[in-house]
Amino acid sequence: QLCGRGFIRAIIFACGGSRWATSPAMSIKCCIYGCTKKDISVLC
């Protein structure tokens, strides 16, 4: 499960820097249910 800082770090790792868009719904989903790298890469 990715919440808070862990979620942001996973996005930065997957997207490579600041090229990502925030998605509150995805953040909540990842925190509650967990996310795969594919789920996170959608935000890039």
From Swiss-Prot:
Heterodimer of a B chain and an A chain linked by two disulfide bonds. It is found in: Secreted. Keywords: Disulfide bond, Hormone, Pyrrolidone carboxylic acid, Secreted. PANTHER family: ILGF DOMAIN-CONTAINING PROTEIN. Pfam families: Ins_beta (PF03488). The modification Pyrrolidone carboxylic acid is found at Q1. One of its GO terms (cellular component) is extracellular region. InterPro entries: Insulin-like, Insulin-like_neuro_ligands, Insulin-like_sf, Insulin_CS, Nem_insulin-like_b-type. It comes from Carcharias taurus. This is Relaxin. Belongs to the insulin family. Its main location: secreted. Disulfide bonds join C3-C31, C15-C44, C30-C35. The keyword Hydrolase does not apply. One of its GO terms (molecular function) is hormone activity.
